[in-house]
């Protein structure tokens, strides 16, 4: 249907997405404009940053910034990402029980909405691990070695995975025995909000949560990969072991056979309950059994009331687990949602389209750039001048069986052209190659080839030919 599957070139270096699906094209254009309106180039005391908090606070908080970071890279906001993550890393301190500042404003101060003193401040305990995971993902996208070796980052990673865990009683075996009153100080304003063991903030007597456990898993898994890249193999193995302990705890104690999903909260009266905390269990890959992923997704989809913050995660999540039509519906309708101006929304839609629908996933640790289209309907989609590593790439998909790739970076790249389906062959510029096979998280077969693409070169791959 799509003939030669040609990748047309965009002559300048402006990021541009185009598609025969005008709904996706319109959503990307809206999200790109909205997200870029939140970006600041360095004119403020805090340095380069983008808004990642409630609008009009002129600030960025740990959860929002971590989630928005890949969308920001897609928009070319690398300087902002590094500066913001470094601000979080550099402000970790013993006086805050190894927390950092939850939210930092453009004047380079802890945001007054969340901070009075080191004894009296708001803090969600997931946050340290969320930032570690974000820094790993930023390294994978950019190849920036500073996320691995910078002294302030390494100090933050090490303290978060050791002293922080000890101080707040956050080991897996402590999840069902810890007190909500750990490290409670005499702060008059924030009280027990100095150390909320969840990203769900409306629950009072909660001692631990599934979303915290999922985030801790993600943080330790990322820490393990960071140490591996630094050739610290013993530390990497230990961190991976700790990550797996969180996963096993989640599976052993939090899974409900009756509900076929995870409980979300553990109360101080020794009981479980359910709520909106499952997003981060999936976001951080804390579940590896396809049946349990499916049960969790289905439970989430049955829930009718979600805040816009959670919804901003859903396109990337649903594409990851093969629910492409549900992801597509959100992308098409988000422009009509209430509170769509919340910064996470536009950044999340950008990631959902580029990393979800187009399946573009750079991996500096493996030296590869993966593409895996999940287009709904018979459409083409193309992105030009996408910032990756040390330069730009362009990618086009024609339906879900033909992809083209142009390398505009300064060095040759390995492109893994992947397609859903069990194909015997994939053609590369008309030459037939034996397809390699792997499975996704749900056990679905993916066929792929790996192509070395030199500087300035373009290649086209088509499945089933």
For each predicted feature, which ranges?
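Acidic/polar, glycine-enriched structural segments that form the non-catalytic walls/loops
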Residues: 5-59, 137, 145-166, 227-229, ...
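Active-site acid/base region of carbohydrate-active enzymes
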Residues: 14-34, 88-101, 139-210, 238-241, ...
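Active-site core of glycosidic bond-cleaving carbohydrate-active enzymes
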Residues: 18, 22, 26-29, 58-93, ...
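The feature captures the catalytic groove of carbohydrate-active enzymes
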Residues: 46-47, 52-58, 102-130, 145, ...
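Amphipathic, soluble alpha-helical interaction motifs
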Residues: 71, 134-137, 141, 167, ...
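Helix-terminus loop motifs that line ligand-binding clefts
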Residues: 76-149, 154-184, 305-314, 322-349
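Non-catalytic C-terminal accessory modules of carbohydrate-active enzymes
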Residues: 325-465
């Amino acid at each position: 249907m799509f003939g030669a599957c040609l990748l047309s070139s965009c002559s300048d270096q402006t990021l541009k997405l185009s598609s025969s699906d005008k709904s996706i094209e319109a959503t990307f254009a809206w999200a790109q404009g909205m997200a870029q309106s939140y970006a600041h180039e360095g004119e403020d005391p805090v340095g380069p940053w983008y808004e990642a908090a409630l609008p009009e606070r002129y600030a960025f908080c740990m959860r929002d910034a971590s989630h928005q970071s890949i969308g920001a890279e897609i928009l070319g906001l690398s300087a902002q990402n590094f500066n913001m993550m470094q601000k979080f890393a550099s402000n970790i301190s013993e006086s805050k029980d190894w927390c950092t500042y939850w939210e930092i404003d453009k004047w380079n101060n802890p945001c007054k909405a969340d901070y009075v003193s080191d004894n009296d401040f708001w803090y969600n305990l997931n946050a340290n691990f969320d930032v570690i995971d974000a820094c790993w993902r930023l390294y994978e996208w950019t190849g920036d070695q500073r996320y691995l070796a910078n002294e302030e980052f390494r100090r933050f990673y090490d303290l978060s995975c050791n002293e922080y865990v000890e101080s707040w009683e956050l080991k897996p075996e402590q999840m069902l025995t810890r007190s909500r009153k750990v490290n409670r100080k005499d702060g008059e304003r924030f009280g027990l909000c100095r150390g909320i063991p969840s990203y769900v903030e409306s629950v009072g007597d909660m001692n631990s949560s599934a979303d915290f456990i999922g985030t801790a898993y993600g943080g330790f898994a990322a820490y393990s990969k960071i140490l591996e890249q630094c050739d610290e193999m013993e530390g990497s193995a230990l961190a991976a072991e700790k990550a797996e302990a969180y996963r096993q705890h989640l599976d052993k104690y939090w899974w409900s056979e009756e509900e076929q999903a995870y409980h979300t909260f553990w109360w101080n009266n020794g009981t479980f309950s359910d709520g909106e905390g499952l997003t981060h269990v999936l976001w951080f890959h804390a579940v590896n059994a396809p049946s349990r992923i499916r049960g969790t997704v289905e439970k989430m989809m049955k829930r009718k009331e979600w805040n816009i913050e959670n919804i901003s995660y859903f396109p990337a999540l649903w594409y990851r687990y093969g629910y492409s039509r549900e992801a597509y519906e959100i992308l098409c309708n988000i422009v009509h949602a209430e509170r769509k101006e919340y910064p996470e929304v536009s950044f999340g839609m950008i990631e959902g389209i580029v990393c979800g629908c187009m399946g573009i996933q750079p991996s500096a640790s493996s030296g590869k750039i993966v593409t895996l289209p999940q287009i709904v309907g018979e459409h083409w989609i193309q992105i030009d001048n996408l910032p990756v590593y040390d330069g730009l790439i362009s990618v086009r998909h024609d339906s879900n069986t033909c992809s083209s790739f142009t390398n505009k970076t300064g060095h040759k790249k390995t492109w893994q052209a992947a397609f859903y389906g069990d194909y015997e062959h994939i053609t590369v510029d008309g030459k037939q190659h034996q397809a390699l096979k792997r499975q996704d998280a749900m056990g679905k077969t993916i066929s792929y080839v790996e192509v070395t693409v030199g500087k300035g070169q373009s290649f086209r791959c088509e499945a089933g030919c």
